[in-house]
Swiss-Prot record:
PANTHER family: 30S 40S RIBOSOMAL PROTEIN, SMALL RIBOSOMAL SUBUNIT PROTEIN US4M. One of the primary rRNA binding proteins, it binds directly to 16S rRNA where it nucleates assembly of the body of the 30S subunit. GO terms for biological process: ribosomal small subunit biogenesis; translation. CDD domains: S4. Part of the 30S ribosomal subunit. Contacts protein S5. The interaction surface between S4 and S5 is involved in control of translational fidelity. Belongs to the universal ribosomal protein uS4 family. This is Small ribosomal subunit protein uS4.
């Protein structure tokens, strides 16, 4: 299965959630394409569970096989499987770059990571799914700091709304991972228990 690269608004409308953040087109028409919006069709329990899984996959840019691996690992970890799943997804390097304010969207963050603009603990990482851990230090590579995007980022980061589990140093474009997030700190509108119910069948 190839990664979806089409209009994000269309997917947002189908799943009834803004997957991008600040999507004005979605806000104008927050109902599925072709439905003319207003009347919601009664949905089965299975469809609701499936939609929640799709929402998680599209939000974090994860394909089906990879998502199954995330779920399997979440199920092995102590604690609630649903909470574990969301924390694993939130710990992806591309998501951390997005959360820190160095990218406007997760899709853009994925591209920046893939192009090799970041190091983690001094080592170049170009895998968006790389999992960060507590006390990791993420830096923009020295040669990448000369890019216009990153030069302008220093000003943007001063007022960036960064999650409490991260710290950003604007002058050096450094991200410090103080801890892994708890589910309560993750503002993604997911009902992860529906995903657990789907995979438990």
């Amino acid at each position: 299965m190839a990664r979806y690269t089409g209009p994000a608004t269309r997917v947002s409308r189908r799943l009834r959630v803004d997957l991008v953040g600040g999507d004005m087109a979605f806000e104008r028409r927050p109902y599925p394409p072709g439905q003319a919006g207003r009347n919601r069709i009664k949905e089965s329990e299975y469809l609701l569970q499936l939609q929640e899984k799709q929402k998680a996959k599209y939000t974090y840019g994860v394909l089906e096989r990879q998502f199954r691996r995330y779920y399997a690992e979440a199920n092995r970890l102590p604690g609630k499987t649903g909470d574990n799943l969301v924390v694993l997804l939130e710990s992806r390097l591309d998501n951390v770059i997005y959360r820190a304010g160095l990218a406007n969207t997760r899709r853009q963050a994925r591209q920046l990571v893939s192009h090799g603009h970041f190091t983690v603990n001094g080592k170049k990482i170009n895998v968006p799914s790389f999992r960060v851990t507590q006390y990791d230090i993420i830096d923009v590579r020295e040669r990448s700091q000369k890019m216009e995007w990153f030069e302008e980022a220093q000003d943007r980061l001063v007022d960036a709304n960064v999650p409490a589990w991260l710290q950003v140093v604007p002058d050096t474009l450094r991200i410090l991972v103080h801890q892994l997030p708890e589910r309560a700190q993750i503002d993604v509108p997911l009902q992860e228990q529906l995903i657990v119910e789907l995979y438990s069948k």
